[in-house]
Amino acid sequence: MFNIPAVAVSYLIGSLSFAVIVSKYYGMDDPRTYGSGNPGATNVLRSGKKKAAALTLLGDAAKGLVAVLLARVLQEPLGLSDSAIAAVALAALVGHMWPVFFGFKGGKGVATALGVLLALSPTTALVCALIWLVMAFGFKVSSLAALTATIAAPLAALFFMPHTSWIFATLAIAILVLLRHKSNILNLIKGKESKIGEKR
């Protein structure tokens, strides 16, 4: 009964674009108008405002975490199924990528996906975060780190998530994140991808 409203609320939470919100708060340009044009922490970092980039990263991760945790806390009282929780997780990411509040022009979903995974399975999220950190510090390329961690996510989920529907949701999330990184993948192949913090 409450499955559809839960998914809708998760989508709306995911639609809060912290890259745009934080940038407006600090009087910065809209991140969709410079650099890669992506409203995410990496692009905000290109502005040179490290604090704004950090807040964007935390905000985008937090909304994924809150959306799914809220559903999990209310799962029993509202009678939500495990499949509904999986749908809520996916909806938070869809909201980030296609936000209703910002003309359906959103980010690539890495931070939000991490927040979602943290709510579903902290161990899975930790594995992905560690992989991201190792790749980011090793190669200084955010997209390469994100892509590697994204590919690892469904594999880690197979071992650490308790429900099949959550594993499939993680796979769907990974596919969406990879698709949103199409241009980054092409740039990596061509050797033209920007380093972390490098202005375009």
Curated annotation (Swiss-Prot):
GO terms for molecular function: acyl-phosphate glycerol-3-phosphate acyltransferase activity. This is Glycerol-3-phosphate acyltransferase. Its main location: membrane. It is found in: Cell inner membrane. Catalyzes the transfer of an acyl group from acyl-phosphate (acyl-PO(4)) to glycerol-3-phosphate (G3P) to form lysophosphatidic acid (LPA). This enzyme utilizes acyl-phosphate as fatty acyl donor, but not acyl-CoA or acyl-ACP. The gene is plsY. Probably interacts with PlsX. The chain crosses the membrane at residues 2-22, 51-71, 84-104, 114-134, 158-178. Belongs to the PlsY family. Its EC number is 2.3.1.275. GO terms for biological process: phospholipid biosynthetic process. It is a multi-pass membrane protein. The lineage of its organism: Bacteria, Pseudomonadati, Pseudomonadota, Betaproteobacteria, Neisseriales. The keyword Cell inner membrane applies. Keywords: Cell inner membrane, Cell membrane, Lipid biosynthesis, Lipid metabolism, Membrane, Phospholipid biosynthesis, Phospholipid metabolism, Transferase, Transmembrane, Transmembrane helix. It is an enzyme of class 2 (transferase). It comes from Neisseria meningitidis serogroup A / serotype 4A (strain DSM 15465 / Z2491). Pathway: Lipid metabolism; phospholipid metabolism. PANTHER family: GLYCEROL-3-PHOSPHATE ACYLTRANSFERASE-RELATED, INNER MEMBRANE PROTEIN YGIH.
